[in-house]
Amino acid sequence: MKRTAFFISDGTGLTAEALGHALLAQFEKIEFERVTVPYIDDEEKARDLVSRINKASEIDGERPLVFDTIVNGGIREIISRADGFMVDIFGTFLNPLEQELNSSSSYSVGKSHSINNAGSYERRIHAVNFALDNDDGARTRHYDEADLILIGASRSGKTPTCLYLALQYGIKAANYPITEEDLDDQKMPAALRPHKEKLFGLTIEPERLATIRNERRPNSRYSSLQQCMHEIEEIELMYKRERIPYLNTTAYSVEEISTRIMVTTGLKRHR
């Protein structure tokens, strides 16, 4: 079964997309064709969107789901004429909140993603630059500045997690790959030992790691299942021996990995 889902907004569409994805994830047996349409900020764009929704309805034989965060009443009225199942995200939540708080909302476009704290913005940009500069064990001499150091096998998700932590939380995260040479020594790499309290380990199912590595270096020893099994087994033994907290990332998205790291380590979002 397939349904089309539109995520529409007069801003970036990030809020509609995030909440819509979270809701649709609860329906695992249904395949969704996801379409994000940002910046529907005038009536002409709204009418064009109505045509797209109606066309999708004709093709699918089912009306599309339409998640929207449109704040302009006139534009919303036009879109409501489309042959779609409308999910008014702001209306659903703001109306009860207005009643509870006895106050009218501002209905401002893009409010949730506005840069209203210059210090927080600068902190996040600095954290992103730190993650890039200290990726893959490149500059271990800067580890004293890190809030967190992710370690793990090559291709276990360290880099995207560091960047997400930087962008979303302002966390200065470095990462260090545990290599076969490190495992042969059967002890923690010397560059990491002074910063043990900042370490957090990532692990992954060997089968999944082999699949990921095969995309990079197909049919190599590096990507073989046997090699991946050996590395993961030894790395997990090191985590346990050194009492380093760690997480199996196989079933988690970058967002989920990052949130679990924040909870486990007790790190706080920089605002």
UniProtKB/Swiss-Prot annotation:
Alphabetized HAMAP family for the sequence: PSRP
Enzyme class: transferase
Keyword ATP-binding attributed: no
Catalytically driven reaction(s): [pyruvate, water dikinase] + ADP = [pyruvate, water dikinase]-phosphate + AMP + H(+); [pyruvate, water dikinase]-phosphate + phosphate + H(+) = [pyruvate, water dikinase] + diphosphate
EC number: 2.7.11.33, 2.7.4.28
Keyword Nucleus: no
Its biological purpose: Bifunctional serine/threonine kinase and phosphorylase involved in the regulation of the phosphoenolpyruvate synthase (PEPS) by catalyzing its phosphorylation/dephosphorylation.
PANTHER family hit by this protein: PYRUVATE, PHOSPHATE DIKINASE REGULATORY PROTEIN 1, CHLOROPLASTIC
Any one GO molecular-function label of the UniProt entry: ATP binding
Keyword vocabulary terms for this entry: Kinase, Nucleotide-binding, Serine/threonine-protein kinase, Transferase
Protein's name according to its UniProt entry: Putative phosphoenolpyruvate synthase regulatory protein
Binding site for ADP: G152, A153, S154, R155, S156, G157, K158, T159
Protein family according to the UniProt entry: Belongs to the pyruvate, phosphate/water dikinase regulatory protein family. PSRP subfamily.
Phylogenetic placement of the source organism: Bacteria, Pseudomonadati, Pseudomonadota, Gammaproteobacteria, Pseudomonadales
